[in-house]
């Protein structure tokens, strides 16, 4: 068997003395693993860094086998990652999130979002896209949020909260008596949200929202903690905001 696809490298682990097992998120074949012979060579180590994009050819005698990769890099991002701890941790977070997807299960829209983010990994305005990626991960793992209308009234305007029980939006008026028990819904995640760049607090509220559901519904049931890359990314994001506030 053989197929060709484009992919985003999300992980590498040693296999024997000279080879590695490469994990990639591909457009048409989902999260997929394969052996890269000679993958520990100096030349290949630079190619096989998480966050790089490549044209991939997978070959195996049978579909259920691990198979082997042939790799042609299309975008190397090491220089950007070495220049920014925030970008480095953002890539780590992307990879950790994509590993939540079942192996060999195609998710082309999720792939497109991940590649879009990776392509702008050095952009300091990246954070809202990472929040949206986490929302997509929740949806693709069966825990999608409904942020389109109020769970109590059906209204589509003035949505301000999310119920931690149902994952559904709640309007400002309907949620006012219970606001201490609800999660804030930042404006940039609402359908009727005006244009403009989200504030740092909006972004942190977005991560707080997605983080609550990711921890409760996805990571904890799998016996996993929240990704260290996520904590590190948010720490770097917050430090940058503090520096900006004092300049």
UniProtKB/Swiss-Prot annotation:
Tell me which InterPro entries the record gives: ARFGAP/RecO, DNA_rep/recomb_RecO_N, NA-bd_OB-fold, RecO, RecO_C
- Key words, A-Z: DNA damage, DNA recombination, DNA repair
Instruction: List the SUPFAM superfamilies.
Output: ArfGap/RecO-like zinc finger, Nucleic acid-binding proteins
What's one Pfam family the UniProt record gives for this protein? Answer: RecO_C
Q: GO CC terms for this protein? A: bacterial nucleoid
Q: Which domain of life is it from?
A: Bacteria
Q: Which GO terms describe its biological process?
A: DNA recombination; double-strand break repair
- Known role: Involved in DNA repair and RecF pathway recombination.
Q: Which family does it belong to?
A: Belongs to the RecO family.
Indicate what this protein is called per its UniProt record.
DNA repair protein RecO
